[in-house]
Swiss-Prot record:
Name this polypeptide is given: Olfactory receptor 52B6
Organism: Homo sapiens (Human)
Record's subcellular location: Cell membrane
Function: Odorant receptor.
Transmembrane segments: 46-66, 75-95, 120-139, 159-179, 216-236, 257-277, 294-314
GO molecular function: G protein-coupled receptor activity; olfactory receptor activity
Lineage: Eukaryota, Metazoa, Chordata, Craniata, Vertebrata
Gene Ontology, cellular component aspect: plasma membrane
UniProt-listed SUPFAM superfamilies: Family A G protein-coupled receptor-like
Amino acid sequence: MAQVRALHKIMALFSANSIGAMNNSDTRIAGCFLTGIPGLEQLHIWLSIPFCIMYITALEGNGILICVILSQAILHEPMYIFLSMLASADVLLSTTTMPKALANLWLGYSLISFDGCLTQMFFIHFLFIHSAVLLAMAFDRYVAICSPLRYVTILTSKVIGKIVTAALSHSFIIMFPSIFLLEHLHYCQINIIAHTFCEHMGIAHLSCSDISINVWYGLAAALLSTGLDIMLITVSYIHILQAVFRLLSQDARSKALSTCGSHICVILLFYVPALFSVFAYRFGGRSVPCYVHILLASLYVVIPPMLNPVIYGVRTKPILEGAKQMFSNLAKGSK
């Protein structure tokens, strides 16, 4: 094992020197090396095991959730359509990062082309769509609880189509300037990214140019986009909870709180780790070791995708019943 690792290091250094030599003054670099989790190299194999388990669980859970929603006509409602979008985004996020990270942790395959790095970064930061979908789900619950008689007339198929289009456009519009800014930077010979995957500032720090605009754009995009979504979601749930506690029927109140509870769990699972990671990175400084930042970021791309299907499967009765029906139909069909 030690000889294999030594060989990988020699090959990596040779490739790095070759790439650097070709790019002394180029605006682009041929490729990048991802370090994995620096400071924990001896634990890479052991760390890869829980990451692999969580990734497989996330794929299976979200895959089942999407199949249940698509196969059961009773679940072809706005809330479940948005939930299937969230599950699809979770699969995209974890699949964009984990296979490459596991190849790095297991085999030391750390090289990734520059275009591949930009592509990975694009899909990772495409998670802005998570925020837009969570906002759409909050709006759905707001209409269902605060204006139940108008629910069908407000959330028509046409309106849902517009919401889906807006969520996708929202993410593309935010991400394209980041790609443009990175493409037009001048890069140095150093092409090592201390991370398990490519992200905006990790790539920007490889540049010899001034990256102030990248820093400010990233901060502005996060604050104006995600911050606005958080504010609107909070306002929606304040109105929702006010309406729920005004309900006279105890059963109706319990059902509404159960549905909203699932949504709130998913919202907290998405925003709390993200905000903690951002604030720890920006204000933790040297007091928080680098490997802690990278470990948290790596966990963030697998833990929410792994837990979201569990939260909805356990707490949402129609999905649980739909899953039972789907597996029952599959069992009958196999006989």
